Design a protein with these regions (language model features):
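Extended oligomerization regions of viral-like shell subunits
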Residues: 112-212
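Acidic, proline/serine/threonine- and glycine-rich low-complexity intrinsically disordered segments
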Residues: 249-251
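Alpha-helical scaffold segments that mediate packing/assembly in large oligomeric complexes
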Residues: 32-120
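Membrane-proximal bilayer-interacting regions
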Residues: 215-222, 227, 231-235
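Assembly/oligomerization interface modules of large self-assembling protein complexes
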Residues: 1-29
Length: 264
C-alpha cells in the first residue's frame, strides 16, 4: 500500500466588491428555485461557498498536474503527476520517447503517438483495457492535432463532426482527455521539468489525489471582508498531495526542446 505525501497548501483569493457581487449574483440567478424578491442569508452563503469551492478546486486541479515544489512561484505547493512521471521517465521506470517541436503540426503524428504508446505499453496496462478505465491524458496541442486528423477523414460522419464538433474523442475505444492546462504550462520556466506538450497512457485509478481539510493543526477555511482594501477575501489552508500508484502501467511521450531521439 502506497502512502500519498501531503503538503500544506494555502489558497487565498481577493475580489473587489463589484466583482464579488457580480459573481455571487450570477450564481444565485442561475438557480431556478431561488426567489429574487425574497433572498435568504442561507442562499447568499451557499452562493459564496460555491464560488470559493470552484476557485479552490481549480487551484488543486492545476497543481495536481503541473505542480513542481522546486519552482520559485506558481503551482509549487506539491509535485504534480507530470513532474512525478517525468522523474520516472528520467530513471527509465516508464516507457518513454521524445518528439520534436513541430511534430503536432502534422495531425497524423498524433495517431502514430497513440499507437506507439499502446504497442509499447506494459502488458499489465493492456490487460486493464477491458475494465474501461484507461485514458490518454494529453496537452491541448496533441488533442487539437488528433481532432484535425479526424476532420480530414473522408466520411459523412467526419464532416458532421467537423460542423457540429465532438463532445469526446477516443482512440480504439480509449478516451483521449484534454487536460486544459495550457495557460498554466505557458507560465512555466524554460528549466521546468514539467513538459509543455505530452501524452500519458495509464489507468485513471493509477493517478491519486489526496486532500485533508480537517486533521492537521493550522488548517482553516475563512471568508471575510477587508474594509482597508475594500475586498472580499477567501482563504483555505489544508493538506494536499498526489502520486502515481504504480509506475509500471504508464506509457509516456513528451516534447523536450532540442531533443530529436524519435522522428514521428
Amino acid at each position: 500500500q502506497k502512502t500519498i505525501p501531503l503538503n500544506r497548501v494555502k489558497a487565498e483569493l481577493g475580489y473587489s466588491a463589484a466583482d464579488y457581487f457580480s459573481l455571487v449574483y450570477e450564481l444565485i440567478t442561475n438557480r431556478p428555485e431561488v426567489n429574487m424578491e425574497d433572498l435568504t442569508g442561507t442562499e447568499l452563503e451557499e452562493a459564496e461557498t460555491t464560488l470559493f469551492k470552484q476557485a479552490i478546486a481549480e487551484s488543486i486541479r492545476s497543481t495536481m498536474w503541473v505542480g513542481d515544489t522546486s519552482a520559485e512561484s506558481g503551482a509549487n505547493t506539491f509535485d504534480g503527476f507530470l513532474k512525478t512521471i517525468a522523474t520516472y521517465s528520467n530513471n527509465n521506470k516508464v516507457y518513454t520517447y521524445n518528439y520534436e517541436t513541430d511534430a503536432m503540426n502534422t495531425p497524423a503524428n498524433s495517431v502514430a503517438m497513440f499507437d506507439d504508446l499502446w504497442k509499447n505499453a506494459d502488458e499489465r496496462l493492456k490487460d486493464l483495457k477491458a475494465e474501461g478505465q484507461l485514458a490518454f491524458f494529453v496537452s491541448s496541442d496533441v488533442y487539437s492535432a488528433y481532432e484535425k486528423h479526424l476532420d480530414s477523414m473522408s466520411t459523412d460522419g467526419a464532416y458532421t463532426d467537423y460542423i457540429n464538433g465532438r463532445q469526446n474523442l477516443l482512440y480504439h475505444g480509449i478516451p483521449v482527455v484534454d487536460l486544459r492546462i495550457s495557460s498554466y504550462l505557458a507560465k512555466l520556466s524554460s528549466s521546468s521539468p514539467v513538459p509543455k506538450s505530452f501524452c500519458i497512457l495509464t489507468d485513471r485509478r493509477n493517478l491519486v489525489l489526496a486532500v485533508n481539510t480537517a486533521d492537521f493543526p493550522g488548517n482553516e477555511i475563512r471568508m471575510w471582508y477587508n474594509p482597508d482594501e475594500m475586498e472580499n477575501r477567501q482563504r483555505a489552508v489544508f493538506m494536499a498531495g498526489c502520486d502515481v500508484l504504480d509506475e509500471g502501467p504508464v506509457s509516456y511521450t513528451h516534447l523536450r526542446a532540442h531533443e530529436t531521439e524519435l522522428h514521428l
